[in-house]
Curated annotation (Swiss-Prot):
Highest expression in muscle and heart. Lower levels in liver and kidney. GO terms for molecular function: ATP binding. The modification Phosphoserine is found at S25, S29, S44, S46, S276. This is Heat shock 70 kDa protein 12B. The keyword Disulfide bond does not apply. Belongs to the heat shock protein 70 family. GO terms for biological process: angiogenesis; endothelial cell migration. Residues 12-53 are annotated as: Disordered. InterPro entries: ATPase_NBD. SUPFAM superfamilies: Actin-like ATPase domain.
């Protein structure tokens, strides 16, 4: 066994190879009293990853919360009847012509910061407040995107309410999740009074697949604060990736539940001839499925008709077009179990329905002035919300072949405020502006041509199509013939027409589920019942740690040379755990062994690094950054214990990391006692 050199440096130890030894903290990085070094424990190469079946927690019911940018909701199913998905109650309030199976992602807090309401209730109450009083209330909407866009997300990140006041983002999200928790548990108690609440619910939270680990951890921390689960029962909470959930759900759909935008029958007509509903049980299921008044949706026990036509190796894309982002995932169907394999790491960007809202706001700035719109939003926040609601209603009716102008009501508060601020009315502003496709109606409305409305969609729609085309050009995803368009924004006729026009010509079939806005929510419930359905995923980044290697002249740069006690070491070597775009199986483990730097040490803290490149050599390379910390909490060592052949005072902790799940996970064991060690990875400590 290679001895550890005596060094006056704090580092961490990893048992892998005789060429590794302690690594000092990189230049400029903070040092910690509890950090440890990497020590070679055995003269062997790094062990190959091992696959271990994931341990599943017991549960009686799955409750999924689809926490969206613009709208949210929950659904559940019992373990005794996993094929029956129960949708949440329809919400009170809402907009004319809009289904209320979800509620707006709007949170209202009192001036003191206490919870008041969520969803339609929050929006309507805030709208009815006196303008002066409304300025003191904290109203949050579309705040999910702030987590995605935050480059330095921490537990102390602040969110700004409509009135400009700030509040910790963690508390804002916890308020929203607590609201859904209370509603879901109340409904469960009514449906199953004998169901014990404690430790019987498996919760599922949906997040975009393009979210990085800090954002996923943030949602988990918010769930802890909201009381969904405790840290001691962390396995009762699953993070589901939105396009994956949609993919899981689409596997269950029957032909009449799909719309092929090419005009073809999704199944080509063959399945209808081969399969018939020949039993009263199937007919009863069909009746229940079609019932408008039923909140229970029954899925197929196996796979749907479209999937039954597919063969092992068939590939398809899921484009989740939501309120804030477009999320793209490529799956390959595996047989005989119908499990899924991810072919390329999740991709996408900030091209959601809110992009159309921002385009409308920019249009208002062109007409009325950017300074006026900013002042109006700040001083009349409730009226601004009212205006956005009016636009949302018209946005939903936009279509590529619609004839006739669209009328958007301007709140009286807007008209009055503009006249007081500018000294003339809004009609004069429209005449003086360079915008000739928006007219003024004497009924107090903006009249916008259909062409003008469709133009507001173009930047967002173009971004979605460009992302899909770039994905299809990747060599890893060649052979894709089917694209599922899902998510709330996928309800838009403008988006559907544009995607079909751009991609249909290249032979790609674009299919839209009929209940497209609820696809992710229902899929999240199914994912909670069987989280192992996605068997292989792609790592979005390269992860590893910094180590010391024996210095090799000609291979290692001279500036990395470190000489200690006559031995020559190369510093800052990036030891890779998993590479970007590497296929990682569910349950596959990367194992490393660590030693505390000194006897009696109670905590081992190891810095983790990541980058987008696959071939980074050093933790100081461009693009490599510290992204988190692996923490091992140690119990006091027993004096005189059997250390399994380790040198006196040496204590080996073996950690196993999993990169094939929706979150990076770690477990650890004390080799000398074979006892579990509390292990965690913190991505929010930076």
């Amino acid at each position: 066994m290679l001895a550890v050199p005596e060094m006056g440096l704090q580092g961490l130890y990893i048992g892998s190879s005789p060429e590794r030894s302690p690594v000092p903290s990189p230049p400029g990085s903070p040092r910690t009293q509890e950090s440890c070094g990497i020590a070679p424990l055995t003269p062997s190469q790094s062990p190959k990853p091992e696959v271990r079946a994931p341990q599943q927690a017991s549960f009686s019911v799955v409750v999924a919360i689809d926490f969206g940018t613009t709208s949210s909701g929950y659904a559940f199913s019992f373990a005794s009847d996993p094929e029956a998905i129960h949708m949440m109650r329809k919400w009170e309030g809402g907009d004319p012509g809009v289904a209320h199976q979800k509620t707006p992602t709007c949170l209202l807090l009192t001036p003191e910061g206490a919870f008041h309401s969520f969803g339609y209730t929050a929006r309507d109450y805030y709208h009815d407040l006196d303008p002066e009083e409304a300025r003191d209330w904290l109203y949050f909407e579309k705040f999910k995107m702030k987590i995605h866009s935050a480059t330095d997300l921490t537990l102390k990140t602040q969110l700004e309410a409509v009135n400009g006041k700030t509040m910790p983002a963690l508390e804002v999200f916890a308020h929203a999740l607590r609201f859904f928790r209370e509603h879901a548990l109340q409904e469960l108690r009514e449906q199953s009074p004998s169901l014990p609440e404690k430790d019987t619910v498996r919760w599922v939270l949906t997040v975009p697949a393009i979210w990085k680990q800090p954002a996923k951890q943030f949602m988990r921390e918010a769930a802890y604060l909201a009381g969904l689960v405790s840290r001691e029962n962390a396995e009762q909470l699953l993070i589901a990736l939105e396009p994956e959930a949609a993919s899981v759900y689409c596997r269950k759909l029957r032909l009449h539940q799909l719309l092929d935008l090419s005009g073809r029958a999704p199944g080509g007509g063959r399945l209808g001839e081969r399969r018939s509903i020949d039993s009263s049980f199937r007919q009863a299921r069909e009746q229940l499925r079609r019932s408008r008044h039923s909140r229970t949706f029954l899925v197929e026990s196996g796979v749907g008709e479209l999937w039954a036509e597919m063969q092992a190796g068939d590939r398809y894309v899921v484009a989740d077009c939501g309120g804030g982002t477009v999320d793209l995932t490529v799956h390959q169907l595996e047989q005989p179990h119908g499990t899924l394999k991810e072919l390329y790491k999740a991709s996408g960007g900030p091209y959601g329905a809110v992009g159309v809202d921002l385009a409308f706001e920019q249009l208002l700035c062109r007409i009325f002035g950017e300074d006026f719109i900013a002042t109006f939003k700040r001083q009349r926040p409730a009226a601004w919300v009212d205006l956005t609601i009016a636009f949302e209603a018209r946005k939903r009716t936009a279509g590529p072949h619609r004839a006739g102008a669209l009328n958007i009501s301007l709140p009286f508060s807007f008209i009055d405020f503009y006249r007081k601020q500018r000294g003339h009315n809004v009609e004069t502003a429209l005449r003086r502006s360079s915008v000739n496709f928006v007219k003024w109606s004497s009924q107090g409305m903006l009249r916008m041509s259909c062409e003008a409305m469709n133009e507001l969609f173009q930047p967002t729609v173009s971004g979605i199509i460009q992302h899909i085309e770039a994905l299809l050009a990747r060599p890893e995803v060649q052979g894709v013939k089917l694209l599922f368009l899902v998510g709330g924004f996928a309800e838009s006729a403008v988006l559907q027409h544009a995607v079909q026009a751009a991609l249909g010509a290249r032979g790609l079939r674009v299919v839209v589920p009929h209940d497209v806005g609820l696809t992710i929510l229902k899929g999240a419930v199914l994912f909670g019942q069987a989280p192992g359905v996605v068997r292989v995923r792609r790592s979005p980044l390269t992860y590893g740690v910094g180590v010391l290697n024996r210095f090799v002249p000609g291979r290692h740069p001279p500036e990395k040379l470190l000489v200690r006690d006559g031995r020559r070491w190369c510093t800052d070597v990036f030891e890779r755990f998993v590479a970007a775009e590497q296929s990682v199986a569910l349950g596959e483990e990367v194992r490393r062994s660590y030693c505390p730097a000194r006897p009696g040490q109670r905590r081992v803290l190891i810095n983790l690094y990541c980058c987008a490149a696959e071939d980074a050599r050093f933790i100081t390379d461009p693009g490599v950054r510290k992204c988190g910390a692996l923490s091992l909490e140690l119990e006091p060592a027993d004096c005189g214990q059997d250390t399994a052949g380790a040198p006196p005072g040496r204590r080996e902790i073996r950690a196993a990391m999993q990169f094939g799940d929706t979150e990076i996970k770690v477990t650890a064991v004390d080799v000398s006692t074979n006892r579990s060690v509390r292990a965690s990875i913190d991505f929010l400590s930076n």
